[in-house]
């Protein structure tokens, strides 16, 4: 289901995105595909690619004063057939670490804590419950697995992979600063940004630059504030909804992933759109109009 664009060289096709070469820049195209447990389902979620792109654009524009971002344009230089779900971005030398930040104890962080009392080697107070807010946001990096699952590592492991401890420290500081900014904004809009992951690279001048996507439903856990209750898993505006459904089917998390029923597709699309409009304060139709996308 890769998006074919005439005359543009396809550099990479991932679980959700295609990357095309524009010469001096790249074209990052978000599809409507959805993956859980690192496996892509055969059923797309309509408008998901446009929601991811619109939210990333919003956050890149919000956080440019914290760290440079790779976004160049969402309209100029973007082919008509992918407008709304594509970004023209700077070429970067990507760094081999997923920069994960956790503000709340959930997912693999909660499992780590239950087993060891720590997350990514960072000791935490005893007695924390699932979904509790952490005393401070934590930088809990992971590897970037080309096949299979990313693996959690500690800061020393991240610094070793990057090969430059000072650069790893800058990534940690930038990740925490961007997370805090986005989490504060989201909270004022009624959404808890529980955790997220970033990717960084170096531009042609060696400047640390935020790449990929920023605080989207695919890279983050978004929880509604008015339903937040520590001690359990939380309802969400992200793909946790599909993860929960997939887990309930008895699927063993190995390919192929099961098709997603129409009702789950419709509810997931509605969650994505609701999250977009709450966070940005703008109707989704405005994003489609801004980019010249076909509604």
Predicted regions, residues:
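C-terminal helix-cap and adjacent tail motif
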Residues: 214-275
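Conserved metal-phosphate-binding beta-hairpin within the catalytic cores
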Residues: 101, 193-214
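A short mid-domain helix/strand-loop element embedded in enzyme catalytic domains
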Residues: 133-165
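A long amphipathic alpha-helix within ATP-dependent nucleotide-binding catalytic cores
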Residues: 162-194
